[in-house]
């Protein structure tokens, strides 16, 4: 473990003698910053300065004062999982009495309810269930597309893809091709957490490695899909590890252009094996969002994470580099299992975006704007968030 930590530090050796102002000026002027620069930004306590730089960079990508959002639902189709992450309160071991696999008809009903209120995206994720074979996933996707041809299936994280490949003794490329052919449209970036082995070995020893997570995303692009990049902080990781995470995401984007968006949030340790860890603050979250926007000069869209941070902090993040409010998320079970529950429907989303001084616009998963809302205009049919 000591050797792993030292290896991460070696990657940012050389440091930087630049001041915070000089680093930010370079970034705002379109120059790339280094991992050493990122570490120096993490060491800074000048949150306002970081936020202003990130906001300036965001406006270069998105000059209009529009904040987008998508109407969608998180469907957790199974909680059986043999990865046993120490920070997860949602999973149950295989064959546990409290585990489940949702019936197809239940999933279909959830999707119908989503479309009935103007929803366009289904984020379907679950545990790494060793009892589910590839045909479970392909048959489910085909059934969904037969009934709901217009719904966008943004589903199955890299860890789930690797589990299917393991169960079937197939390559992840072959698995992804079969899923894409059956109706999978894009891949969410769940399970990235921190892309360094020292942290992953400490908190999720059985989970896919950083390289495997990146390979899944690159392969998804190869077979005709795209994905999102994510980052979770609060595991006790070093600033150097955070910088290395960002570097690996930036490198993958340079190589393949596989990411449409970046989303970060804080570890929610309640009810988990990491409950003794000190929970990070909203300021830590906003700093990470800002530094990520400053560093990741090749990803256009940054989502706010109101699900973990709450609507008010989510609103504030729109001035720290985020141009998107994420999904309204009719249903969410994983974060709420860790005793963190925030509920935001479509009309509250519109209100929060307007309070931030922005114009709300509904988008699809490809970040194409479907509808821009005028002042005081609301959705015709809304929902109550379910858990």
List PLM regions with ranges.
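Conserved, mostly hydrophobic/aromatic
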Residues: 30, 54, 85, 124, ...
